[in-house]
Amino acid sequence: MPACNLILALTLTAPLLAACIVLSILCLALLIRVSKDRAKLLQRGLLFRWPILSVDPGHISPALRTTELGPSLDSLVSITPSLGVRGGISDLESCILAALAKAASARELPGTQTHIFEFGTCTGKTTHHLALNAGHLARVVTLTLAPDQHTTYQRGKGDDPRDTHAALKESAFTRFYYSGTNVEPQITQLFGDSKALDITPHQALYDLIFVDGSHARSYVESDSRLAMHMLKPGGLILWHDYRGPWRARGVWSTLNALAQSHTLVHIKGTSLVVYTN
């Protein structure tokens, strides 16, 4: 009889125990998810601060400084909103890039050209912003894979396949957002794999370089190495998608490693990281 009672008790309590275990697992998963989302919002890890120091935009350029009345009028720029464009950057990031392009031109002597380079054209929307705000004397060079060049993509050992897929998916255009606009004559469109780029004509030429090509680690490393050689004294390099260890890990790991030998800063409220030569 006692054995029967024990079996009956186990039969009745087993579903309740299983439900409690499942509920505990779900609560733990929810807690981790909320903690991750909060960490992303604060731009820090679950238990640690991000390795690259976060600074206010005004730390990067006087054009991005604010007063109690609002942002500097030097940051007044022309952009079009993101509205879910493939591979796009946020409106705040667009404003910062556009303001830095404008500021780069303002630093040049009258009649002197400003030179800007972009790794990763995608739709050409950011390219348009850079050319439009840098002024009519600026020259923007932008590089992407053409749709018929996907076989030349050089996936590195250890690259995340998802980064490869995303890079090829965004290399789908031969006509761009800037095509047919009044800034198109200022833009030089290059097609090809960035790992094969001959930087001989680009050495120490550029005032501003935007690295937003493939986020696979081998490409971020290669593009960053090239950008360092292409940057002129006093110029800026900006990288996109420094979002913590959960997304774009190739960007995250490469920039954290680069920060060991170069002074990099992360712009608060964005996924942009900056290096000043």
Task: Please report, for each region that a protein language model flagged, where it lies by residue.
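Long, hydrophobic or amphipathic alpha-helical segments
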Residues: C4, L8-G45
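Hydrophobic transmembrane signal anchors and adjacent membrane-proximal interface regions, especially
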Residues: C4-L8, F48, I52-V55, L132, ...
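N-terminal topogenic membrane-targeting module
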Residues: R38-S75
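S-adenosylmethionine/decaboxylated-SAM
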Residues: I60-L64, E68-G88, S94, A98-N277
